């Protein structure tokens, strides 16, 4: 049976009327309108599962997808999960982070996908690059400050000995 213009499944792609495809899931916290989501890749880090890339504190998230090890992030109530069900738990997450539960276990180095709000997180590769750059800049800045302090102390000692 043919469908008329404007009649269609709301989950269909909107490319027919020129609109780009978007996520039509709405949050259950009273937010009106669709919220865009961006897939973010997290890597398992050893036996503790994925870490929260936003805060980089090294604390595993306490949402267990497998016995004995956390393997998922959870965010605001009612976000869509990859399996289609909605997340029903609410963990305290840093401001701006809103991710959903991910099922499955992986060994060290395996990838797991988490959906986060657009703009709240960078990809892990960008963070690692920024982290390395930040460390290099910090170390160079500390070295420059130490060298300047040594030069100032040396000049002060030279001036003091010349006055004597």
Swiss-Prot record:
UniProtKB keywords: Membrane, Metal-binding, Oncogene, Transmembrane, Transmembrane helix, Zinc, Zinc-finger
Chain spans, region Disordered: 1-41
Localization annotation: Membrane
Main localization, broad class: membrane
Keyword flag Cell cycle: no
GO molecular function terms noted in the UniProt entry: zinc ion binding
Domain of life: Viruses
Keyword Cell membrane among record annotations: no
Positions of transmembrane segments: 136-161
GO CC terms: membrane
Membrane topology: Single-pass membrane protein
Zinc fingers classed as unnamed: ranges: 122-135
Role summary: Stp is required for transformation, but it is not required for replication of the virus. The T-lymphocyte is the target cell for transformation by herpesvirus saimiri.
Protein name: Transforming protein STP
Species of origin: Saimiriine herpesvirus 2 (strain 11) (SaHV-2)
Lineage: Viruses, Duplodnaviria, Heunggongvirae, Peploviricota, Herviviricetes
């Amino acid at each position: 049976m043919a469908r008329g213009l404007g009649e269609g499944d709301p989950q269909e792609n909107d490319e027919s009327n020129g609109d780009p495809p978007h996520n039509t899931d709405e949050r259950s916290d009273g937010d009106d309108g669709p919220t865009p989501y961006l897939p973010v890749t997290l890597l398992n880090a050893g036996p503790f599962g994925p870490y929260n890339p936003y805060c980089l504190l090294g604390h595993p998230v306490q949402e267990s997808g497998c016995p004995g090890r956390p393997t998922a992030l959870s965010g605001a109530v009612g976000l869509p999960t990859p399996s289609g069900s909605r997340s029903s738990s609410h963990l305290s997450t840093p401001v701006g982070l809103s991710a959903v539960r991910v099922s499955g276990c992986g060994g060290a180095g395996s990838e797991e996908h988490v959906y986060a709000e657009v703009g709240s997180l960078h990809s892990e590769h960008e963070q690692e690059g920024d982290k390395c750059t930040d460390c290099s800049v910090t170390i160079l800045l500390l070295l420059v400050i130490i060298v300047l302090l040594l030069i100032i102390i040396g000049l002060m000692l030279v001036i003091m000995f010349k006055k004597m």
